[in-house]
């Protein structure tokens, strides 16, 4: 994992484990997890949490699939010790009988550092996303060595000696595909939409209050319903972007925001259903 991500993971789990332990001690009538003014945590438990956490493993696997340098290795005990010392250079850390002690460190120090590092990481990621959006708007979406451009391959259908192909334009890009493949993708699209809309009907409600000042290039529901996606994955991407737009469009906690979050769960269920059906 990247240095920033590794620090956030270790810091968050330290905070979580100490908080959980303190709550347990308080419930049992004891004090907080400290000796004098020193916070304590089991290094073995911290390492196991990091190495076996489902979300962390998913992040590591995604970075491995993306061939991210130094992003596909799990953190070991020595890595964690180094990170802890780098996180708290002004505090002495000792290791005795598997217990990692943070001398003079208090919970509010951990919380303050966690907030600072999260805010810094978030700002960096937002800026990178903004740069990527500008690049995509300027140059289009690149896939492999080729770059997909609107209306590409138009006019190639009906070539002599080859089966007819159809150029199908979606709101995002053009596709040249075999009619049989197009028919299957249309069937898949209709099945997914019917399954998604049969749950609560909330999906269509996401498109009733567009806001171009917040979301660039919002997707139109009729385009999703009538255009043929280039692949199963592209349809999922389009649906996911529609929901993400709905989440980003509204203030956290509002009814519309909650609706978009609910649709996210419905999409996840629908995707799992379709995967099982295809298998």
UniProtKB/Swiss-Prot annotation:
Subcellular localization, as worded in the UniProt entry: Nucleus
GO cellular component, one term: nucleosome disassembly/reassembly complex
Keyword Transcription regulation applies: yes
Keyword Aminoacyl-tRNA synthetase attached: no
Subunit-structure text: Component of the NuA4 histone acetyltransferase complex composed of at least ACT1, ARP4, YAF9, VID21, SWC4, EAF3, EAF5, EAF6, EAF7, EPL1, ESA1, TRA1 and YNG2.
Family: Belongs to the EAF5 family.
Task of the protein: Component of the NuA4 histone acetyltransferase complex which is involved in transcriptional activation of selected genes principally by acetylation of nucleosomal histone H4 and H2A. The NuA4 complex is also involved in DNA repair.
Name used for this protein in its record: Chromatin modification-related protein EAF5
Organism (species): Saccharomyces cerevisiae (strain ATCC 204508 / S288c)
Record lineage: Eukaryota, Fungi, Dikarya, Ascomycota, Saccharomycotina
Underlying gene: EAF5
